[in-house]
């Protein structure tokens, strides 16, 4: 185990003044586990982590004490005259196995998606990835769970760090996290399990835009999560829509706020995908026990949304979803 400490430049207690400097100084042997302890502060950095077996943990009392912050956005024009686009807008890009982020805030500060477009906070394309007690903040496209779909809809649409990489599924586990945004703010093709998380809609839009590949058993599973509104009007958001035709999103024992539309999910105008997507719920319940009738219209779900029974729901346990071929159990 190799341990490093990062602290703001004025704090002499840190071995490194930035995460980027710490990344550059990690042991070359990728099998050596590295823990980076990050002292409280705001780190204005755009980061790429390509080394496996790394744990990065905030040393503050809460994740809001240690913030990794940047503000790139999709509509920004690059020096070559081309828009930055979605996949070059990230604050933190992780492309390595066995990485854990703990007690951190990762944010994209670009702001309003109407004027700035897509702005990724965390771009995670990796296997056996864990985010524990983290805040992941943005607006449109806050969290990308790679890989990318096989093909882009428009030329140059996937321009970014993994546009030419093999499309290899990875498993990701988000526990006790706060994730916010407005449009498609959790999206991608990974197998990702969200447990005990707060998923906050900042305005009208869609929480998920899964692109689960055809034949992949699992996409997104939300267990014991809270779908909350922070400035989003009643019935103005959907749990998800299919970025690709085989999207898979399952909710189990989740609290649903009144901001979620009675239909639950949207088909993105893809009526042909009604028979190929898996959008399903088990024991969804209203966030507030005494809320108005408007937040409990689960009988009004779209006809392509399934209700699971207990036996079906058991198939989506954390143990099964994340096991893979190596029996991983975070």
Regions found by a protein language model. Name each.
Residues 1-330:
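Sequence-level preference for short, compositionally simple segments enriched
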């Amino acid at each position: 185990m190799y341990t490093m400490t990062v602290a703001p430049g004025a704090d002499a207690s840190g071995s490194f003044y930035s995460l980027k400097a710490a990344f550059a100084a990690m042991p070359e042997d990728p099998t050596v586990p590295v823990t980076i302890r990050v002292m409280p502060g705001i780190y204005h950095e755009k980061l790429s982590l390509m080394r496996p077996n790394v744990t990065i943990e905030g040393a503050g009392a809460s994740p809001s004490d240690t913030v990794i912050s940047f503000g790139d956005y999709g509509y920004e024009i690059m020096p070559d005259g081309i828009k930055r686009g979605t996949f070059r807008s990230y604050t933190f890009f992780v492309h390595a196995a066995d990485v854990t982020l703990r007690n951190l805030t990762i944010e994209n500060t670009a702001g309003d998606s109407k004027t700035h477009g897509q702005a990724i906070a965390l771009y995670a394309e990796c296997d056996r990835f864990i985010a524990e007690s983290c805040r992941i903040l943005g607006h449109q496209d806050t969290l990308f769970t790679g890989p990318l779909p096989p093909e882009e809809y428009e030329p140059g649409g996937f321009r970014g760090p993994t546009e030419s990489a093999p499309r290899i599924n990875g498993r990701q586990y988000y526990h006790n996290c706060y994730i916010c945004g407005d449009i498609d703010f959790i999206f991608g093709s990974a197998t990702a399990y969200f447990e005990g998380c707060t998923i906050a809609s900042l305005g009208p839009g869609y929480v998920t835009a899964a692109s689960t590949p055809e034949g992949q058993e699992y996409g997104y599973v939300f267990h014991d999560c809270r779908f909350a509104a922070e400035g989003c009007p009643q019935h103005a958001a959907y749990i998800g829509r299919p970025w690709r035709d085989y999207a898979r999103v399952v909710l189990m024992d989740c609290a649903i706020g009144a901001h979620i539309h009675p239909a639950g999910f949207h088909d993105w105008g893809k009526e042909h995908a009604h028979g190929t997507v898996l959008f399903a719920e088990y024991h969804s319940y209203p966030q507030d026990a005494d809320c108005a009738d408007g937040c409990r219209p689960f009988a009004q779900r779209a006809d392509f949304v399934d209700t699971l029974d207990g036996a079906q729901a058991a198939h989506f346990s954390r143990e099964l979803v994340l096991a893979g071929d190596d029996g991983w159990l975070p």
